[in-house]
Structure formats: structure tokens, C-alpha cells
């Protein structure tokens, strides 16, 4: 999907993910995957837009406390280093919104998703909660959100949410 993006596919049948292999119609599953992969650019754009809408709305609703960030923090020796990287990726106006006001625009978030210096991973934490992180040059930038897009057998998104 996006540069450095890891994709995990899960198969659900009637809302259950513990499925008896004999119940699975492998041809139907393969057809669904083919449909999704045939329209890669469409899915990239659609999922990216949905993800940006969900994540950015959540991000901007939070009341971040400076300099102690609640769920947003920087693991680096210098905040200036992070600011320089952001200036290169999302330019001055959006960088100032993040650094000064903790406000993220959807367009800036999409640029972060597309940047080769950003990596998106899905981790399983010790307490078995899914977590989502964007890493920039091994510096953690956002944490604790994951985007789910659930597709049906027609290759359409049935539902999507952040957890």
C-alpha cells in the first residue's frame, strides 16, 4: 500500500476469526484478494483518505499537554531534529501547526504516510492491545492507534474504524 506499510489480512466468517478450514471457499477468498489487488491505486487512495479522516479527527480532538505529550511524544535527543525532518516532509505551515498547536491536517498526514522516511507498523503490546505507530528514522512520532478496513467478497469496504 503506502511506502513502508505493513499489511495484515485477517479472514472473518460470520463475525468469527476462528474458522474451520473446511468451511472456507478458497476460490472465493482468492477472487476477493485479486479484486483488491487489481485496484491497488484505488484502495491506496480510499484507505488513505478514510485513515486520514479517522486519525486526524481523533488527533485534533485530544487535549495535548506541552511539554508532556500524552500519546504523542518524540524519542530523540533534540526536538529540533524532528522539526527539520517534518519541514522537509510536510513543509512549514503544517509543521508549525503540529509543533506549536499540536494540530494535524489531513493533507499533512497523507504526506507522512507517503514519505519513504516514515514507517508504519502494527505491534502487539504486552497487554494484548493492538497499537499503531509511525516511526521516523527510528524516532517514535505517533502511538496507540490502528486503522482497520474490513472488505467484503466484492472487494468493497464494509466498515472501517480505528482502535
PLM regions: where:
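Acidic, proline/glycine-rich low-complexity IDRs
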Residues: 2-8, 113, 117-163
Amino acid at each position: 500500500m503506502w511506502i513502508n506499510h505493513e499489511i495484515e489480512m485477517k479472514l472473518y466468517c460470520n463475525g468469527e476469526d476462528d474458522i474451520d478450514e473446511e468451511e472456507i471457499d478458497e476460490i472465493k477468498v482468492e477472487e476477493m484478494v485479486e479484486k483488491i489487488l487489481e485496484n491497488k491505486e484505488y484502495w491506496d487512495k480510499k484507505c488513505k483518505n478514510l485513515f486520514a479522516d479517522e486519525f486526524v479527527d481523533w488527533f485534533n480532538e485530544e487535549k495535548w499537554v506541552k511539554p508532556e505529550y500524552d500519546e504523542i511524544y518524540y524519542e530523540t535527543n533534540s526536538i529540533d531534529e524532528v522539526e527539520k525532518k517534518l519541514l522537509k516532509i510536510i513543509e512549514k505551515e503544517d509543521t508549525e501547526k503540529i509543533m506549536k498547536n499540536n494540530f494535524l491536517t489531513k493533507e499533512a498526514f497523507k504526506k507522512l504516510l507517503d514519505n519513504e522516511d516514515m514507517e508504519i507498523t502494527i505491534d502487539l503490546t504486552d497487554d494484548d492491545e493492538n497499537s499503531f505507530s509511525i516511526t521516523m528514522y527510528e524516532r517514535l512520532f505517533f502511538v496507540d492507534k490502528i486503522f482497520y478496513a474490513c472488505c467484503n467478497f466484492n472487494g468493497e469496504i464494509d466498515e472501517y474504524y480505528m482502535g
